[in-house]
Amino acid sequence: MHEVYDKWHIISRDSYNYDHEQIEFTEIDHIVFTGMGGSGTIGDVFSSILSKTNIHVSVVRGYLLPNTVDSNSLIVNTSISGNTVETLNILDSAKKKNCKVIAISSGGKMEDYCKKYNVNFRKIPQYHSPRASFAGFMYSLLKILGPILPIKQVEIKESITELSKLQSRIHSGNLLDDNLSLNLAHKINGIPLIYYPHGLNAAATRFKNSLQENAKLHSMVEDVVETCHNGLVGWERPSSIKPILLQGDDDFIKTKERWKIIKEYFQEKNIEYDEIHSLKGNILTKLICLIYQLDYSTIYCAAISKIDPSPIHAIDFVKQRL
C-alpha cells in the first residue's frame, strides 16, 4: 500500500492533466455526491469547495436520494470499485427521477449499467484499493467537474505542489524525526477522538475511517464547537480515549476561542492531547494535504503494531452476505 501513497503527488498530477471529458450540464441548483467510504470523502471535499457558491450540495452515504432532487439536480455517483451496492441503487433512482447524472468508477457493475442505459460515465483506474485510490479519483473529478467548480486551476496546481513537498517529508523512505506522519503514529493510542472545526470535517472523517481500516482501531470524530455543548462532559470520567485536535490555519475567530478553552480544560484535567495543524492555502490544499498526512500516519500506525493495513476482513464478511 505504501508504494501507492509514495506516488500520490504523481498520481494527482497525472490524473488532473489527463484529457478527461468535462461535463456540459447547465442550470444546476443542487449537486448530490453519492458514495461510501473513500468515495464519500470525495463528496465531503467537494462540499467544502462548493460551500461558498449558491449551489445546494448534499453528500449521501447510503441507499436513498433526497426527495428534493429534480431535473435541475446533478447526481455525482462515485464507486471506486464500481460494485458498491448503495451507490448503484442511487444511480438507478437518479436515472428514474430524470436527474442529471454522471457516474465514475474503475469499472464493475457501474460501468455495465451506464453502458446499458446510456448514462454519462468516466472510467478511472484503481490503485491497490479504493481508499488508496482517493487521490486519482479526486483529481480526475476536479477536471471532469471543472466547468461548475469555483476553484481556480492555479489553486489545484498549488495543491499538487504542496502535496509533493509533503511527500518528501512523510514518504516510506524517510523514517527520521522530521516525518510528521510517523511522529503522529507513535502517539496514537487508546481510542482516538478527533476534534475538528467547520471546513475540515472531510479530513477528520477520512482520518477516522483510515484508522479503522488501516490500523484496525476504533476512532471517533466530533465538531469542536458542538462538543462544547455535550461531548466535553464525557471527560469528567476517566477514559482510554485520546483527544486529537485537528485545527485549521484560518479557523473562524470564535472557533479559535473554543480551541483555546478546550486546551485549557484538558490541561487542568491532566488529559494528554495531540495537535495537528493544516497548511496555509486554499481549502483544497488544506484538505488534500491533511488527508495525505493523516492517511500515512495510519499506515505507519499499522506497521508499528505489526499489522498489515491492506486486508479488511470485517468488510469482506458483510459483502459476502449481501
Give the ranges of each region predicted by the language model:
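A generic structural motif
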Residues: 59-62, 217-228, 272-281
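C-terminal active-site/capping subdomain that shapes the small-molecule cofactor and substrate pocket
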Residues: 233-313
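Glycine-rich phosphate-binding loops that contact phosphosugars or nucleotide phosphates
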Residues: 26-168, 186, 248-274
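A short, charged, Gly/Pro-tolerant segment at domain boundaries
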Residues: 311-322
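Short helix-capping/linker segments at secondary-structure and domain boundaries
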Residues: 17-18, 54, 144-154, 215-217, ...
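Conserved, well-structured ligand/cofactor-binding cores
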Residues: 2-25, 66, 157, 274, ...
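Active-site phosphate/pyrophosphate-binding segments
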Residues: 2-4, 10, 19-23, 27-30, ...
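Conserved active-site and cofactor/substrate-binding residues in soluble primary-metabolism enzymes
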Residues: 3, 7, 41, 45, ...
